[in-house]
Amino acid sequence: MFGSLFKKKDTQRHPSAVPKEGNQSLSTTEAAALTKKVAALTTQIEQITDDKNKRHLLYNQLGATQVKLGNDLEAIAAYEASVKDKEEFGDAYNALLNLYETQRKQAAKAKNDDDIQKWVTKTDALLDMSKRVMRSGFGY
């Protein structure tokens, strides 16, 4: 009677490793183009001193480009600068959560307790920022 409701889980349906978007190997021309884009974005950011919204968007682009190049630490620096300019949910927030988790996992593999604590602390600070954003949106 209930045979059709309870099915066995198919273990073959779930792949063991899901390829990540940023870990694809880039050709030399793609890498060179992305490196040029990083240089151009960095120059634009240095020239903008008063418009935080525009600088925020440029930092987001810089972070995304650094992720494509596989430069996680540089991407983290760009996204942190973006969040510093404008605290909001969005690309920078989501990317930082993912990058912090990746760095924490690498530190755990290397059994480096100091780095694990560093990335956990950064994640906690980002979550605290999300609470501030939520509260500011509702007038608390």
Which functions belong to the PLM regions below?
Residues 48-51, 85, 133:
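Structural marker of alpha-solenoid helical repeat scaffolds
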